[in-house]
Amino acid sequence: MKKEDLRIVYMGTPDFAVEALQCLVEGGYNVVGVITMPDKPAGRGHKIQYSPVKQYALDHQLPLLQPEKLKDEEFIQALREWKADLQIVVAFRMLPEVVWNMPRLGTFNLHASLLPQYRGAAPINWAVINGDTETGITTFFLKHEIDTGEVIQQVRIPIADTDNVEIVHDKLMHLGGRLVIETVDAILEGKVKSIPQEEMAVAGELRPAPKIFKETCRIDWNQPVKRVYDFIRGLSPYPAAWSELVNPEGEAVVVKIFESEKLPKVHTLAPGSIVTDGKNFLRVAVPDGFVNVLSLQLPGKKRLKTDELLRGFHLTEAFKMKAV
């Protein structure tokens, strides 16, 4: 079968999913329809905002469906009418069997980890938070349990000690577009030899990648300096690690921290204690050193470098970060 004859339905929502869709369209593959999340109000004005995948589909006149419920009969019928040979899922939702089992060649997913590691909603964040030095991207066929299907292909990349989640996200996004094309071509050529995940070698224990909530992002200053440093970069710039900054009167505000340095050092200060000259630097004590805060954000303010913030905010060593 030629690629022009292979009927592909594509499912995805965020920017991460646009790259692979763009690679398919620009590569001359036959994308017969796109499925994305319903429109949602966003921002302070609650204006209706299209998902990045919807915007791309509209810009390129691709047929589009935005089901509220994936088991809805009208949606299922509309999907059947597209007569897909293959479905591709990138950063979308958990699909019911009636959807993923529909095409004759199956449905494959692009997942931003080296499966079976980091099954779940936030694999890039957790790989950085856990201080991993390597991650990657995987294509696999869908089955009942989430992120457990047979692996088709994988690509590995290093994680530098200075990478934050945005940098790793963008690297994987670009790699993912190419891997989707390679996977489609392998399926077209009948060269796929998928591997059950339980047969794949894994270094160390399996780690999950659960969805990240606000409380997940609270910094625990009782942790070692490297752990806190990795935690901050694993949540930067979004959704952002945060802590409560407590003034001498005991009043607290939430401060988001985006960039830091690790400064291992022996000291006797309590975790969360602040060391600052009030002008140029802000360091927070942890048991085995200090976290040097390089950029942060106060409520209702924009993100600033530490020295910029200190010029407009009178911070002394009588302040502290709530250790948790």
UniProtKB/Swiss-Prot annotation:
Belongs to the Fmt family. It is an enzyme of class 2 (transferase). (6S)-5,6,7,8-tetrahydrofolate binds at S113, L114, L115, P116. The keyword GTP-binding does not apply. SUPFAM superfamilies: FMT C-terminal domain-like (SSF50486), Formyltransferase (SSF53328). Pfam families: Formyl_trans_C (PF02911), Formyl_trans_N (PF00551). This is Methionyl-tRNA formyltransferase. GO terms for molecular function: methionyl-tRNA formyltransferase activity. It catalyses: L-methionyl-tRNA(fMet) + (6R)-10-formyltetrahydrofolate = N-formyl-L-methionyl-tRNA(fMet) + (6S)-5,6,7,8-tetrahydrofolate + H(+). One of its GO terms (cellular component) is cytosol. Attaches a formyl group to the free amino group of methionyl-tRNA(fMet). The formyl group appears to play a dual role in the initiator identity of N-formylmethionyl-tRNA by promoting its recognition by IF2 and preventing the misappropriation of this tRNA by the elongation apparatus.
